Amino acid sequence: MAVVLVTVVPLGTATPSVSQYVAGVERVLRDSGLKHELTGMGTIIEGDLDAILSVIRKMHEQPFSQGVLRVSTSIRIDDRRDKKGSIEGKIRSVREKLGD
């Protein structure tokens, strides 16, 4: 199972606020049914890598449908094959090492 961090940034918008575009991107991801976590700087998605990459393409296209003329999308993929990984597992591992 892959864990992916994706950030979709609309460029050249009328105002510095991009939350309306982020909401549109989040809606696409919610409709996919993939497990994910929205953060202040991006979205973490876990699941089958092919399914994730397919929905990322749709997420990237969403701001264009809202009139944006340029979009920058950054993707970081953690595709571990020796054992099943998860968002919670990564956080739990660090917290255990911190003694939390």
Residue ranges and their predicted role:
Residues 1-100:
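Charge-rich, low-complexity N-terminal segments
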